[in-house]
Amino acid sequence: MNKLIAWIEKGKPFFEKISRNIYLRAIRDGFIAAIPIILFSSIFILITYVPNVFGFTWSKTMEGILMKPYNYTMGIVGLLVAGTTAKSLTDSYNRKLDKTNQINFISTMMAAICGFLFLAADPVKDGGFSSAFMGTKGLLTAFISAFITVIVYNFFVKRNITIKMPKEVPPNISQVFKDIFPLSAVILILYALDLLSRAIVHTNVANAVLKVFEPLFTAADGWIGVTLIFGAFAFFWFVGIHGPSIVEPAIAAITYANLETNLHLIQAGEHADKVITPGTQMFVATMGGTGATLVVPFMFMWLTKSKRNKAIGRASVVPTFFGVNEPILFGAPLVLNPVFFIPFIFAPIVNIWIFKFFVDVLNMNSFSIFLPWTTPGPLGIVMGTGFAFWSFVLAILLIVVDVIIYYPFLKVYDEQVLEEELGNKEANNELKEKVSANFDTKKADAILATAGASEADTDDTSSVDETTSTSSTDTISEQTNVLVLCAGGGTSGLLANALNKAAEEYEVPVKAAAGGYGAHMDIMKDYQLIILAPQVASNFEDIKQDTDRLGIKLAKTEGAQYIKLTRDGEAALEFVKQQFNN
């Protein structure tokens, strides 16, 4: 098993390169920007259709009133994502351009939205246009519009093809004329594509694209498709790669289209049979976090003999219940641990097989409601599928099955740890260092340390490689703003908080903030230093183009080093100081 994992890790650079692809990243970040709209609209689905389960049905008039906010938000999500995706892709292209010759992201957003209307909207007799393909049905077309828009803009801006204005003309006026050529080219190209589609296949581009990808959508919803998709999430995470960065952009259009299709099927009184949805990913395949780990902390707490494992279980129960499973992933650890390779990969797959059986054979409705990913898995299953009877059975069954899958491997691992404890050996040092080098383990480490489950020696927190100094914090004399970036923005808060606390204690002019990689472009100019957490350290060369252009210092950290910095605020301040001395 160790040889298998070592062989798998050899492919890590290739997959990391895929995860940094600017087009995949644009899709992911475009969706992230639209999440508030999607969450808001789902509230009205719950209000409108959940009462049906209890025998209460709204009148058609009231149903129309309640669903209007949904139709006017989620109903145009394709239109909105065209703009947000274009904005994200524009940021990526601007990294490669001279700082005095940048693409105007506001212009690309407007052009992508206008172009999307050409590709997805049909005129209606009374004026205006149909919105049938402006929602999730138009997502693939939204990506096409965004990509073509930014590529065309890059062509014009890079070659400085523009209407040149005298230097006396204000910059905002010059920008208007600079955008005329690329915007016109985008509209004409996408309009020509629309005319071509209507002439050849007699429908708009959005509908034509859906027809082309329909077999793929069907295949993805099949047994092999769901196995590959949800197995990949766990596989990539196990070997140290942020799986969602690779898998989610590839299936985003399918999942959200299926979610809306399921809703329409329920509205029509039919069976909602589309399996691949956001809820399937969040509450079935990754119930309790990647690896379907909801049951694992409870098993560590109740079914192990090792004191260390019991402590880790107690510390991990609450966060894992809400889908934050870093404490058990990195505390046990589960990832990069040969003992847990099989259950970590196959528990999500078995979960999705059971769910598909319930949908296909028992005629249970699939997910039709979008819920926050922090919703506890069993509750997410019940709420997301409309409180159906079978959803309660499914939630209980998945818990039982996951316990059965993990149990034999847990016993093997517990015996290993127990033997080490009885022999006064330091447990799994090599494995823990490997995990720290491959993952951003700061959140897990902090939670475990607080709960008394960490085995880290206190001396570790006072020797942060080359960053410790007891007299250097007073050398930072000017106001220094620091931005800490991680994959999602949540866990980077630990280092930011450590810096702020130490800065206040030692009266050092340092202010730190946490953020997520991909959402940093608009705010990074306000900082003098950006620190990359280990999870996003592979993006160092990409972001360095931005920081060099803006005159900002950039630093990346490794796993063990980062953990120690989050524990020792003084060492974190010294780390900041050293970046300006290098």
Swiss-Prot record:
Could you tell me which residues carry Phosphocysteine?
486
Q: Does the keyword S-adenosyl-L-methionine apply?
A: no
Give the bilayer topology. Multi-pass membrane protein
Q: Which domain of life is it from?
A: Bacteria
Q: Where in the cell is it found?
A: Cell membrane
Write out the entry's keywords from A to Z: Cell membrane, Kinase, Membrane, Phosphoprotein, Phosphotransferase system, Sugar transport, Transferase, Transmembrane, Transmembrane helix, Transport
Q: Which reaction does it catalyse?
A: lactose(out) + N(pros)-phospho-L-histidyl-[protein] = lactose 6-phosphate(in) + L-histidyl-[protein]
Tell me which residues make up the PTS EIIB type-3 domain.
Answer: 479-582
Per UniProt, the ranges with Low complexity bias are: 464-473
Q: Name one GO molecular function term.
A: protein-N(PI)-phosphohistidine-lactose phosphotransferase system transporter activity
Triggers of expression? Induced by lactose, galactose and galactose-6-P. Repressed by glucose.
User: Record's Gene Ontology CC terms?
Assistant: plasma membrane
Q: Outline the segment boundaries, as ranges, of region: Disordered.
A: 453-473
Please list the residues that make up the active site.
486
Q: What is its main location?
A: membrane
- Biological process annotations from GO: carbohydrate derivative transport; phosphoenolpyruvate-dependent sugar phosphotransferase system
Q: What SUPFAM superfamilies does its record include?
A: PTS system IIB component-like
Tell whether Signal is among the UniProt keywords: no
Instruction: Give the transmembrane region(s).
Output: 30-50, 64-84, 103-123, 137-157, 176-196, 222-242, 283-303, 339-359, 381-401
Q: Which CDD domains match?
A: PTS_IIB_lactose
EC assignment: the record states 2.7.1.207
Q: Which residues form the PTS EIIC type-3 domain?
A: 8-409
Q: What is known of its domains?
A: The EIIC type-3 domain forms the PTS system translocation channel and contains the specific substrate-binding site.
Q: What is this protein's function?
A: The phosphoenolpyruvate-dependent sugar phosphotransferase system (sugar PTS), a major carbohydrate active transport system, catalyzes the phosphorylation of incoming sugar substrates concomitantly with their translocation across the cell membrane. The enzyme II LacEF PTS system is involved in lactose transport.
Q: What is this protein called?
A: PTS system lactose-specific EIICB component
Organism, per UniProt? Staphylococcus epidermidis (strain ATCC 35984 / DSM 28319 / BCRC 17069 / CCUG 31568 / BM 3577 / RP62A)
Q: Gene encoding this polypeptide? A: lacE
